[in-house]
Each structure stands twice: as C-alpha cells, then as structure tokens.
Amino acid sequence: MLNMEQRDQQAAFENNTFAAVMNHAKQVTSIHDQNISEFVTRLSGLLPHVGSNEERIIQMEVMAALSVEGIITVDNIAEKSAMVKAITEMIKYDAEKRETAVAIARKIMK
C-alpha cells in the first residue's frame, strides 16, 4: 500500500507523463499538417504536366508523398524508380485506391 507521499509522487509522475504525451501528440499533428500542405503544394506543381492519364496522376502522387517523407530526392530518384513503379501499380490495380488517388488529384486541381 502506498503512503501519501508515494501517492503524490505517482500522481505527479502520471500528470507529467500525460502532459508529455499530449505535447508529443501536438507536435506530431503539426508535422502531419505541414506534410499535407507540402504534399498538396508539390502535387499542384506536378499535376498540370500529366494531363488526365490516371497512371501518371497516381505516379505523381506517389512521388510527391515519398519526397515529402524524404524517401526520394533529386539525387536518388533513379534508384527509387522501381519502388515508385511498384507502389503506383499497386494503387492502379486496386479500384478503391485508384478512385481515391484520382479524386484527391481532382480536388487539388480545383
């Protein structure tokens, strides 16, 4: 059984832990919001150059997402082309994912 001082210490620890978790959640949300904004900005610059070809639209979305996450860069794009193609193909052949990707692109282009 905990004495009063131990209970106070435990409560303080739990409060500090909760505050730390909430602060981290706010930081993650902020980073997420920044990533979405960067994704939309990059995609807005790419989409006008691909026309209405769904495969190219999906490919541009994949490339924008991977670049925002730092997975592909100007220096390694050739090395990552197989990964981009594999992800693009996966989305292209899944009707639900394809429709979602195209809908996102249309929304960004409006």
Which ranges hold each PLM region?
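Low-complexity, intrinsically disordered export/secretion signals at extreme N-termini
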Residues: 1-52
